Amino acid sequence: MKFENTEVYGFKRALKGMRNPLESWHKNDTVEENGKVVIGENDLGLAQRLIKAGSEHRKFMRQIFVSVDITAPLYWWKEFDTYKVGTVANSCSTMHKIAEKEFALEDFSTEHLQDCECVSEDEFYEFPCGRRYTPMDSLVDTIKMLNKWRDLYINGVHCGGCLKIRQDKDIWWQMIQLLPSSYNQTRNVMLNYEVLANIYKSRKNHKLDEWREFCKWIEELPYSELIMSAGGLDDNSINAKLGAVRHLKKQI
């Protein structure tokens, strides 16, 4: 899973608008310096109080926007697509571009697939001839089959001495329905801090690695303590998370 080209914007306007109900704009102390936002003590304190007061009081969170390019397997995108409100996504199309390049093992998420070097007796299928067949073998054969159909789609197929039309839809269907859900797709995604808080609350301990990686990416965003607080973490847990992020950045 990859996160690229992360951009966060809207802090200054959102935190100024946060003060509209009480008309306390004179206390607004958030500034932009060299393209970076520095939230002042007054604004940060009010934001934290509004977050603790509940979602109906923290509307400013919906006005802080995040744009990012995410590469992840289709099985994760299927779950991500349940978040319809407050998200926009443009994806690389498997419908239109599935035959654009040859399929390779690197195009799939395979970190948990068992291979012959590490499987026990009950983790592979054995053919009558004695050949052992692991999940990784199955994916490799599927990739070979996908590339075979891709070649037929691009170059056409001879049938009864005649060249069947190239880019035939029947051939295209073979690739579409054979494509495993571990295939990685890239999307440009637009979210906001309120959506991220809801995701963080429900997914931070999810059994899918991709959701936990997503939540770690959230923790690295500017002023992510606002998201984590809205997501249900207490101050001690937030400080521990932020400390881990700072330590990681020092190592990098």
What are the functions of these language-model segments?
Residues M1-I252:
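Family-specific signature for flavin-dependent thymidylate synthase
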